Amino acid sequence: MDKIEVRGARTHNLKNINLVIPRDKLIVVTGLSGSGKSSLAFDTLYAEGQRRYVESLSAYARQFLSLMEKPDVDHIEGLSPAISIEQKSTSHNPRSTVGTITEIHDYLRLLYARVGEPRCPDHDVPLAAQTVSQMVDNVLSQPEGKRLMLLAPIIKERKGEHTKTLENLASQGYIRARIDGEVCDLSDPPKLELQKKHTIEVVVDRFKVRDDLTQRLAESFETALELSGGTAVVADMDDPKAEELLFSANFACPICGYSMRELEPRLFSFNNPAGACPTCDGLGVQQYFDPDRVIQNPELSLAGGAIRGWDRRNFYYFQMLKSLADHYKFDVEAPWGSLSANVHKVVLYGSGKENIEFKYMNDRGDTSIRRHPFEGVLHNMERRYKETESSAVREELAKFISNRPCASCEGTRLRREARHVYVENTPLPAISDMSIGHAMEFFNNLKLAGQRAKIAEKILKEIGDRLKFLVNVGLNYLTLSRSAETLSGGEAQRIRLASQIGAGLVGVMYVLDEPSIGLHQRDNERLLGTLIHLRDLGNTVIVVEHDEDAIRAADHVIDIGPGAGVHGGEVVAEGPLEAIMAVPESLTGQYMSGKRKIEVPKKRVPANPEKVLKLTGARGNNLKDVTLTLPVGLFTCITGVSGSGKSTLINDTLFPIAQRQLNGATIAEPAPYRDIQGLEHFDKVIDIDQSPIGRTPRSNPATYTGVFTPVRELFAGVPESRARGYTPGRFSFNVRGGRCEACQGDGVIKVEMHFLPDIYVPCDQCKGKRYNRETLEIKYKGKTIHEVLDMTIEEAREFFDAVPALARKLQTLMDVGLTYIRLGQSATTLSGGEAQRVKLARELSKRGTGQTLYILDEPTTGLHFADIQQLLDVLHKLRDQGNTIVVIEHNLDVIKTADWIVDLGPEGGSGGGEILVSGTPETVAECKASHTARFLKPML
């Protein structure tokens, strides 16, 4: 079996295609966005490979696995078990970190448990248990003739007169003791003060160091250890300042007796109670009610709503504030910012123990007076948040919560004991906070001695390999402690790719979805090297990809097309790259051979130095106090290697600030910055990302873009509808009335099968049309509402040509290249690139003011060369209306058409975070320090 044969694949829009795919090769599937690449790679090949493997398991095991739907295909042979690495599923679990996903943390836990050296957190001395022979040898290694005494500590730093203890010691025959550092006779002990802390050590033996003492010393040590419960001190008799030798037979700190259980891997896991910091439960952050969120606008007065829910409108709470104002003599009508710090403290944190006279008035106007302390607004919110049963109250209060690093563990997530175990003077949290590149250096230079080297050998190999794979997929800038929620789709995908290589499987079919997303050209070669490595192990690697380098590196290319959606689903060309270039119908071939290309614009829009948006002192994540200057009304690209700080600067700093000031939204807290100027040039900010436009099958392009409302109004205006009294609501499949109630307007009914995938069967009442018979009797221009929803955008544009409002909205969907999706197509079936373009179309169809700030993060994801051309036309059109466009992008075709580039770097992670150069593409291409310039120059 050296090939995979597919016959009659009809999944989604595939048109009954037949394919022969060579095994153990690197195969790139390419084509327009929406042409059916994912349908072939994921929904047919992967789904079938996975399904066959899972069906070989017992029925009992199958119920725990989510089964894939059986693809609509006549026959596939030559499949191997399949593993898919997609972008979607990043973990939203706050306990997942880069270290735990890659399993490096598990190996680190093992390493620290087996060769770690525990130390005392207070005295920084190694905890060690010694045998009597080791103690004797240590004493005998002192210079010969030295006068020493052996002490057994009985009482350490405890208050009291301790007369009983001293009498007991004397009665046991001991003559001397050292009390608080002074040696005295036990026959006449000093009187100890009751309120002071005392230390009492018994002198067990006094001797001069010489060779024949071994037996005597061993007996003395045994006595001393028994008396003291496991510790002994050897002190110099002549020089009281000399350093004393501390011995312990327990696994403990010889100074304070701090001891810990035997080291085991779970002590280093922050997801296990044995290792997690008890304050934050191993999350590394604590939630608290943030005064800055509670008081959004310090210019308002308390009466005017400085604290939401505590103003005039809320009678009960406002009475409390008024009584508080009478007591502390402040004015509830004065702006919050003008009140004294003490008033701020009382209002937010309460009056402590001080009783205050509160006047309460009930609905009838009767006043009652009660005296009690004021709990404070923040404490009140905290209490209500903990006690409430209502999810609405909890959601409302959650808006005021922020996170801060846990004070006990300083954000390391581990308990105190685990933070004080060292390997080569480095504790575990220090390794987790290193970037992966640094960690790799650390382990390469780690030299352990003797037995420890043998124990650690295998563990270190596993850690080293995994770090190396992460570096090879371009993730050297991440830290192991980075939370999984903060990773971008491309990063998460490449982490999973690295852990797959770490697994070293052979004979598997890997299906990858655009692994180059979010990767700078510089890291691309390493990524391709990784894929080729997977192939050379003996795996079939199938990649859905648009990247030119990937297509050139492939052994076998499959070009799906010729168009998208209903116009796609056929194999236009397949074979090595030369064969693809020779097929005139293949768009991919034309772009690869240079017959078509994305042109560099003839002239760029010059920047107007008067009109700029200036953000100063951005310091989020790895940004090093940078100042960003964006020309207003231009198409700007933010570039830089992965991890250089692009997303932090734009998505985490600029966007939240602009959102607060322009849209009045209070969603996200911007990363730290000093100042921003120039927002007055804009009236709104819009972020167009690739998140799905709706998570339910009921959401679709028609409802999202607002096309559906006028369509329903048209249907409600038909004479027949008016005669029956139908309103536009009758034509909605989301409300009772017009929809089919058997399937509640879904068109399908879900049948749960416990050992097989859930089956969706068309509803037998409406035959999948979503509406009841009466609604479907109404026709507009001869079509029912169901037939309209079933039209592609292109057909609908023609059909509604006479309705200008609809025609305009549909035209914008066509402008962004979505001619082929259906109006009623479920949002869950759209790809990321398609969802993003539906959003773009929605923005385009609004009447533009020409003063909008658009922010796009890697809009070329999932787009073919021809799609990128269309996207650029749309973005340039938006710019020509005077809008400002900021795009984070790695794609050189987009970068070269920008008016202005801001390049961050020079490296990722701690090696980045500076703005290297900003200016026109021609200026940037000349910058020696920039990695982007190196790749951009040949394009211009």
UniProtKB/Swiss-Prot annotation:
Q: Which Gene3D superfamilies match?
A: ABC transporter ATPase domain-like, ABC transporter ATPase like domain, ATP-grasp fold, A domain, P-loop containing nucleotide triphosphate hydrolases
Task: Work out whether the entry's keyword set contains Cytoplasm.
Answer: yes
Binding positions for ATP per the UniProt entry:
31-38, 640-647
Q: Where would I find the C4-type zinc fingers in this protein?
A: 253-280, 740-766
Q: What does this protein do?
A: The UvrABC repair system catalyzes the recognition and processing of DNA lesions. UvrA is an ATPase and a DNA-binding protein. A damage recognition complex composed of 2 UvrA and 2 UvrB subunits scans DNA for abnormalities. When the presence of a lesion has been verified by UvrB, the UvrA molecules dissociate.
- PANTHER family of this UniProt entry? UVRABC SYSTEM PROTEIN A
Q: What is this protein called?
A: UvrABC system protein A
According to its UniProt entry, this protein's organism is: Escherichia coli O6:H1 (strain CFT073 / ATCC 700928 / UPEC)
The taxonomy runs:
Bacteria, Pseudomonadati, Pseudomonadota, Gammaproteobacteria, Enterobacterales
